Swiss-Prot record:
Localisation per UniProt entry: Cytoplasm
Species the sequence originates in: Neisseria meningitidis serogroup C (strain 053442)
EC numbers, comma separated: 2.3.2.6
Name of protein: Leucyl/phenylalanyl-tRNA--protein transferase
GO molecular function, one term: leucyl-tRNA--protein transferase activity
Keywords of the record: Acyltransferase, Cytoplasm, Transferase
Source species taxonomy: Bacteria, Pseudomonadati, Pseudomonadota, Betaproteobacteria, Neisseriales
Catalytic activity: N-terminal L-lysyl-[protein] + L-leucyl-tRNA(Leu) = N-terminal L-leucyl-L-lysyl-[protein] + tRNA(Leu) + H(+); N-terminal L-arginyl-[protein] + L-leucyl-tRNA(Leu) = N-terminal L-leucyl-L-arginyl-[protein] + tRNA(Leu) + H(+); L-phenylalanyl-tRNA(Phe) + an N-terminal L-alpha-aminoacyl-[protein] = an N-terminal L-phenylalanyl-L-alpha-aminoacyl-[protein] + tRNA(Phe)
GO biological process, one term: protein catabolic process
Length: 241
């Protein structure tokens, strides 16, 4: 198996179809995590999965788990929490803090996090460029002061939102953020949410699998279409009681 070494002065990626067929999805390895390379990766259905000894490993996953916003499913227990909870969901209020919490979150069957400091710096750059966004669920503490309880972040290009990572400091906080974010993104024009991997967690929200070729074609069409309105920073996307 030959793994392509990505040139530092060229952000083009090899065909992910070859990587899926012969390299377990490993598209290539780079010595950088530049914002331009990240954006080109997402446009092609590729994402950085981890780093080792200063090298970044880029993968494609197929079939691809996605959510079509109008087919979002909210589990019954979560719907009850959305109706009765005392939460507030905001957008881009504390992006760096959300990424840091995602990096610190314990993951089943993982010794550490893939969100190393280099990843945090790279996504913060995308945030400054207007491509990376965080959704934050806030809950009141014992004193009544509202505090960050959970959330997630991802990358937006055109009418596609690429989900990256979640965290929860209180039960259901990340789920609340996601359930509020999907219709909000749909209202702005997002037509596809990339979940990257097929997980039970995303299946509960109605994720479905697309063959990678179909997924890549959807990206080709939707990445080129601008949103109706920029995501921006919002203090309240939705809130409970």
């Amino acid at each position: 198996m030959r793994i392509p070494l990505l040139a530092p002065d060229n952000y083009a990626f090899p065909d992910p179809a070859y990587a899926l067929a012969w390299c377990d999805g490993l598209v290539g390895v780079s010595g950088d995590l530049d914002a331009g390379r990240l954006l080109e990766a997402y446009r092609n259905g590729v994402f950085p999965w981890f780093s080792r000894d200063g090298w970044f490993f880029w993968y494609a996953v197929g079939p691809r788990a996605v959510i079509v916003p109008e087919r979002l499913h909210v589990p019954r227990s979560l719907a009850k929490t959305l109706r009765n909870g005392s939460y507030r969901v905001a957008v881009n209020g504390c992006f760096a803090e959300v990424v840091a919490h995602c990096a610190a979150a314990a993951r089943p069957n993982q010794d550490g996090t893939w969100i190393a400091p280099e990843f945090q710096t790279a996504y913060l750059k995308l945030h400054e460029m207007g491509h990376a966004h965080s959704f934050e669920c806030h809950y009141p503490d014992e004193s009544g002061e509202t505090r960050l309880a959970g959330g997630f972040y991802g990358v937006q290009i055109g009418r596609v939102f690429y989900g990256e990572s979640m965290f929860a400091l209180q039960p259901d906080a990340s789920k609340i953020a996601f359930a509020c974010a999907v219709p909000f993104l749909a209202d702005l024009g997002v037509e596809l949410i990339d979940c990257q991997q097929d997980t039970e967690h995303m299946r509960r929200f109605g994720s479905e699998l697309l063959p990678f070729a179909d997924f890549a074609e959807r990206l080709r069409m939707l990445n080129a279409v601008p949103l109706k309105e920029e995501i921006g920073r919002r203090e309240v996307v939705c809130k409970g009681l």
